[in-house]
Swiss-Prot record:
Subunit structure: Tetramer of two alpha and two beta subunits.
Gene: glyS
Protein name, UniProt field: Glycine--tRNA ligase beta subunit
Key words, A-Z: Aminoacyl-tRNA synthetase, ATP-binding, Cytoplasm, Ligase, Nucleotide-binding, Protein biosynthesis
Pfam family, one: tRNA_synt_2f
GO cellular component: cytosol
Tree of life domain: Bacteria
HAMAP family the record matches: Gly_tRNA_synth_beta
Amino acid sequence: MSKDFLLEIGLEEMPAQYVTSSVAQLEKRVSDWLNENQITFEKIKTYSTPRRLTVLVEAMAEEQANRVEEAKGPAKKIALDDEGNWSKAALGFARSQKVEPADLTFREIKGVEYIYIKKEVIGEKTTALLPSLEKVVTSMTFPVSMHWGSNDLRYIRPIKWLIAMFGEEIIPFEITGVSTSNTSRGHRFLGKTATIKQPSDYPNALLEQFVVVNAEERKQAIVEQLRELESMENWQIKEDEDLLEEVTNLVEYPTVLAGNFEKEYLELPEEVLITTMKEHQRYFPVFSKDEELLPHFVTVRNGNHENLDTVARGNEKVLRARLSDADFFYQEDLKITIDEAVAKLQNIVFHEKLGTLTEKMKRVQKVALMLADYLDWQEEDKQDIIRLTNIYKFDLVTNIVGEFPELQGLMGEKYALLQGEKPAIAIAIREHYLPSSAEGALPQTDLGSIIAIADKLETLVGFFCVNIVPTGSADPFGLRRSAFGAMRIIQANGWDIPVLELLSRIVDMERAEGAVELPSDDVKKEVQTFLKNRLRVVLQNHHIRHDIIDAVIGGDPNTIPQLVDRAQILNKHVESDWFRPTVEALTRVMNISKKHEGNVEVDPSLFENKYEQALFDEIEKLKYDYANLTIVDRLRAFAALRTTIDDYFDNTLVMSENIELKNNRLALLFELASFIKEFAQMDEINVK
């Protein structure tokens, strides 16, 4: 037999961005509790609004199933006394398990006998277990939480009501003075209380009180109303999933309405208008079918269609004030030159241990010029780098960016164009913030890519130099994101920049600037290890096997595009028939070559058989061809060596008692091993 179960946590309005994750957490905790208590059920449905987190468990068993449990007790030598009777330890074990001594048996485990009991446990009634769900509710965690009243519980918002029902029965428990009942609350202004007769009635009972408890239904209702408005007005209202998710979690009964603003505000940069509407007011911007921004907006009301004109006028008034402020800020910004703005950067501290923004920009300039040298850029291009790095943070002191920080870079591009900077420089000012997320868009220009890489790597190394490094989940300065972003840009451009060497040079530059608190070699080692770990993430995103990741990073990880290519090619051929014997042969070379010592050069006159000469000839050919071979051709060249390597080992005693012969043979293998290791640390690859 089974019944439905309903649990609703009624709260003061939660921050919209935490509603979805909170109800998902509640679902998981309830599911885990049910499984731990061996209570079967068919499915769990979730409902959520800004004022409630709810789970409805369908077809929950009315009692646990009877089950057989086993328990292990003391060893036999402890369980029996000298006369073969049960000892106090054995009798105590029997009492603790609520069985008679006669029920005790022995079982051998790894040569030692232990007491065991097997007992049937009668399943408990579900109603007897459900009150402990109180701990599930109180154990929830949130990104933000608060105290209220005189209780000790920290929660996302104060709990105002609770429902816990199994079928028609109320499950009794209390949290912070709030007792469970079968009564919920409707819409704050339009609804009344709702008495739930049984769990399955919950959605409809709340709908009668102007609450759409199903978040997906609220979202779909908003989308349908947006599409209807588009069709009616011949507008285009672009779907923004983040904004749609947020407004869905801001309302309980959604009604879409439109408003207007003065056409003269369209003279502001489009990004300023859109940001004002979306980020500050949670409005949807309106476009024409030709993608032109129109002097209208769409918002979602938490209520019905009554007095929509009044609501629209109120929203228009708020937006008008916002746009008036933005227009003032924009006009003030146009009065100052870029150089005047740059001068103010020397008064802004980037970090107390790393100086001002002006000082950071000078360091980034040096890094960008290092990158330009690696890429053989011409002097004219380097002059663009110098101009760019002299100004690229200037918009941080503008009024618009002060009011709308999310527009940094975007406004820099616009102001730079207005003041006659080269388009390439203006675009790079915007692009240096990219990517803004792990999967975000990358810079599309070479200049933007250079400055983005330089800015990110200088930030990374700078913080390592003053011993500020990510620990566990803590990364307050986004250093993991900086490293990952820089590597994505390098890979996307296919630039064979020696990254580890570059990091070492940046550390030396930081020391020259007086920013290094730790020994330079220690910093170099730490930051290079950190970058290698980020490289692992890059390769994991390409679905590379973990052992192959270890192999290529253990080889030469210096140039990122080549590293990714090597990993992908190894991953592609790992199931090929020739792959295993090739890896085994190369691994044998690498392992024995580790015994090579000193600077012994190969002397062909010491060869004693044709197999030594054959391997030597193949290595000489590899030396000559290697630099011009593609990554896949290098792997083919190694595979072609397998027979020669096998013949060599079958017919040559490397560790000869003759020291001169031994050293000569180790030197030959060491030469080959150096090429293998540059490609990958083959002994890391699992071919068993």
